[in-house]
Amino acid sequence: MKNFKGTFTALVTPFKNGKIDFASLDKLLKQQLAGGVDGFVVNGTTGESPVLTSSEKAELFKHIRNVCGDKVVLIMGTGSNNTAQTIEDSRKAEEMGADAILVVVPYYNKPPQRGLYEHFKAVASSVKIPTILYNVPGRTITSLETGTIRDLAKVKGVVGIKEATGKIDLASEIIKACGSEFVMLSGDDGTYVEFLGVGGHGVISVASHVIPAQMVQWKKWVSEGALDKARADIAKYNDLINLLFVEANPIPVKKALQLMGILESAELRLPLVELGAENTAKLQAEMKKVGVL
């Protein structure tokens, strides 16, 4: 099994004139590999998965695998609020060569904890590759409770969770309930260093598009016992991280990547639209302040 304890970028999907912009994607992948990230999540929230067709998802994954080879871990987002569809997409991800699947809590349906357990158990049982749970109640409304996560950690194939509430007490509670072998990945960039401080293993990040080397370094410092050093360094980037979420992700990060000259366009697909002028000015000023422009 691949190592899922590391720094993973939740990749944007670059667009140009309504199509996937593979030239910009290649520039982004080159920058990310140079920054030392351990892998990528493809077809996640940041990748605008709801507006990609099945063929686009497959084309995107295959292109990234061809460019990166086995140098990085590739995790495919396959979650939906339809268990049968999630199973179908998870099997496709396995066939394409994904190292793991990332499965979000079903949204809109508002299932009870019993339903969540059965959903994730059914998905994990349908494939041989590892399953990573994804808890993000800010988008799904429904949240996985610690007891449910503990029970799912015992299901064959369920290896970890992307915990995106930003609640450090909750992260600590899950770690105690599930043990150190259960992979804990932060889904909240602003609290990442504190997450590592209570025993977290890594991150699935948006900010790593812009500051990949720094995100990698923070984990290294914490693993070496230099938590305060990591805390002091992330403090320099707090305003930047906040601005990367000033509008719905991935709106700001696409603009940031365009400003950096990595993406040709900050184009998104409706219903998302490009970052407003006022917030663009704030983002650009902060990027210059911290030295990424």
Curated annotation (Swiss-Prot):
It is found in: Cytoplasm. It comes from the Bacteria. It catalyses: L-aspartate 4-semialdehyde + pyruvate = (2S,4S)-4-hydroxy-2,3,4,5-tetrahydrodipicolinate + H2O + H(+). Keywords: Amino-acid biosynthesis, Cytoplasm, Diaminopimelate biosynthesis, Lyase, Lysine biosynthesis, Schiff base. It holds the Pfam family DHDPS. It is an enzyme of class 4 (lyase). Pathway: Amino-acid biosynthesis; L-lysine biosynthesis via DAP pathway; (S)-tetrahydrodipicolinate from L-aspartate: step 3/4. Homotetramer; dimer of dimers. It comes from Bdellovibrio bacteriovorus (strain ATCC 15356 / DSM 50701 / NCIMB 9529 / HD100). Its EC number is 4.3.3.7. One of its GO terms (molecular function) is 4-hydroxy-tetrahydrodipicolinate synthase activity. Belongs to the DapA family. The record marks 45, 108 as: Part of a proton relay during catalysis. InterPro entries: Aldolase_TIM, DapA, DapA-like, Schiff_base-form_aldolases_AS. Transmembrane segments: none annotated. Its main location: cytoplasm. GO terms for cellular component: cytoplasm. The keyword Lyase applies. HAMAP family: DapA (MF_00418). Catalyzes the condensation of (S)-aspartate-beta-semialdehyde [(S)-ASA] and pyruvate to 4-hydroxy-tetrahydrodipicolinate (HTPA). The active site is at 134 (proton donor/acceptor), 162 (schiff-base intermediate with substrate). GO terms for biological process: diaminopimelate biosynthetic process; lysine biosynthetic process via diaminopimelate. Pyruvate binds at residues 46, 204. This is 4-hydroxy-tetrahydrodipicolinate synthase. CDD domains: DHDPS.
